[in-house]
Amino acid sequence: LPDGIHVVYVSPLRALNNDMRRNLYEPVKGILEAAKDLGVELPEIRIAVRTSDTSPYEKQKMLRNPPHILITTPESLALSLNAPKFRDLLRNVRVIVVDEIHDLASSKRGSHLALSIERLENLTGRPLQRIGLSATIAPLEDVALFLAGFHDNGEPRDCCIIDARFDKKVDIRVIAP
């Protein structure tokens, strides 16, 4: 796996970012161990969190040995795009995942993030795969349009909406003496 950041995961909540790092690290570690047991050598997949809580030491460490998956906030993504050395690490990004997108889509933070995503796409020189996640999106089409953005001619970009909601069947019985 070439050095550089390939996936950017954005969440509005720093605590969620730390949880996501743990939730990604364990399965990746398990996959690497299982592959090794089968005699298959897989490349290391590095995961890092960059937020306002990230120490200067950790930021320098990321410059020397960049993560493949960067977990960040909208504000830290914007700052990363403005930092010349770190910006260079973002040139390989192919995928951006926006979690809790419902929280961002209709806010100033969301407008700022939309601009950062366009800047990131311009930096990479290719269309990014954009993935939005939420358990409470409504209406789906409006949020999808927010994430997909628009072409230079003002036309909305194509996107695919996957509605993974399901109706939970509840069986309630009242038993009274």
Please give the residue ranges for each predicted region.
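Conserved nucleotide-binding/hydrolysis micro-motifs of P-loop NTPases
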Residues: 13-17, 22, 53-56, 75-78, ...
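Conserved helix-turn-beta segment of the N-terminal RecA-like "Helicase ATP-binding" lobe
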Residues: 16-49, 146-153
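Conserved catalytic network of the ASCE P-loop NTPase/AAA+ motor domain
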Residues: 1-3, 39-43, 61-65, 86-91, ...
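SF2 helicase catalytic motif II
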Residues: 70, 74-78, 84-126
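Conserved motor-coupling elements within RecA-like helicase/translocase cores
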Residues: 44, 53-70
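Conserved interdomain linker/interface between the two RecA-like ATPase lobes of SF2 helicase motors
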Residues: 118, 129-177
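Conserved SF1/SF2 helicase motif Ia
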Residues: 1-20, 35-36, 123-127
